[in-house]
């Protein structure tokens, strides 16, 4: 180690708030170059290379072939797929000296589709699975947690091409099996969950999550069956609360709100929220229809496309489900000014009855002050309507409902969905919470926090169709291949291992990905212990054992503290006090063994075999 570059720190940097960030910095694995940008030092690179080797072994075992696509991609490919316009500021865009538009790839669907379309033109060329281990860049607005959410990162991303759905499904399952094997070998227990498609698009998606107290994902899990989903995708049932409202009266009008009758207005001065409506009309929240207006956020900005969403008053809207329904990258709540321009009504009195007609009139009389896209119609995505009304499926089961009347200080009662308003689409848009019922077995769901390490997608023909990749089938007909894509974040995976394998003294690496198997420490630095350590070093290297020889002229306490911090699985000490016996201590469990000098290398090799066995992990 006297000639090795592994600078350790006694304390963590102030901006390192989670264990992995603190320990990787303190133990000399990485160094921060700028916000969200990290350099790997020799120890860190050895760990990453071992993770890469495991990934390569498992992917090549299922017939996936390695190649490399450029990190810097021409904008033309992303314009073909449409993602140049749909993805926002997270894309780092640039121009070269010839004024050609480029981007730093956050993912590589476009590049691999372009790679394949020039050479794979017959059904005989498929199925085909390709992967790369390469750098990516995503311009995170708030990079944090060290390697967990950095701007530049390394991914093992794979792409498969198929002639039919059955073939895609088989390959998808092979990747799922390979991913489980990868994470098991690395030393992580993962949870596979149903996931939101997001900007990737496609037909089906699954994430591999590792449980973490600092996870940025909320998972909904069933304790009785196998159902598991990211909260963005989770479905569930929320039973109606037992309110005993068998004969609720409108105290202001004296009429029975439970009696099916024609819709009518009720004066509700200064009543703008569901909670205020509950108190004013003495009705439970689940009797009310909550209407929210969103602007569809596209690139370039199209501030003239809106969607009104109706949901039962006691439920919350899942914006990810709304984005998936609309097939748009993101939605944002409309401003109060936009709501008024669209409906002629202030926030608090919006409802679905007559809203589409109000929106149509607003569009006919639109002004750039409220709808900037009206001044530049060419910038608006043509297949998105100006206004649409959608409803959560809970709304369509309601009767005698209460909602805003599109009039100040006024609500409508005895509203019948389907009679008094008809949404353009009905879907599951509810945000599922812990305690909601599993749709498969009825058990209450519970929550866990997790970090995403891997992701599988069935993309269908989303990219092959938009980028005109075709093949000739057995009947001579041109078809679009179906795609799958699969990714593992190496940096996140490395950091997650540290999150799951550390203690108060430092990191405790699983042997499979530890930078070295053994750290060899002679005490003192000179005379007999050093000579004995050199001899043992040669014997271990002859056996193929990776050894870090701490030959620094440091105090024993410094060497021991650094060994614990760095986290190498086996510490071997040759001390003037104990020779000719050799002291071996495991980092995990702190078990200590003594062997003679003559037998030390053989016993150490056996001990490492035990540490490598699944039972020891």
Swiss-Prot record:
Function: Catalyzes the attachment of proline to tRNA(Pro) in a two-step reaction: proline is first activated by ATP to form Pro-AMP and then transferred to the acceptor end of tRNA(Pro). As ProRS can inadvertently accommodate and process non-cognate amino acids such as alanine and cysteine, to avoid such errors it has two additional distinct editing activities against alanine. One activity is designated as 'pretransfer' editing and involves the tRNA(Pro)-independent hydrolysis of activated Ala-AMP.
Protein EC: 6.1.1.15
Written domain comment of the UniProt record: Consists of three domains: the N-terminal catalytic domain, the editing domain and the C-terminal anticodon-binding domain.
Gene assigned in the entry: proS
GO molecular function, one term: aminoacyl-tRNA deacylase activity
Reactions it catalyzes: tRNA(Pro) + L-proline + ATP = L-prolyl-tRNA(Pro) + AMP + diphosphate
Keywords tagged on the record: Aminoacyl-tRNA synthetase, ATP-binding, Cytoplasm, Ligase, Nucleotide-binding, Protein biosynthesis
Subunit and partners: Homodimer.
Main localization, broad class: cytoplasm
Family stated for the protein in its record: Belongs to the class-II aminoacyl-tRNA synthetase family. ProS type 1 subfamily.
Broadest EC class assigned to this enzyme: ligase
Name of the featured protein: Proline--tRNA ligase
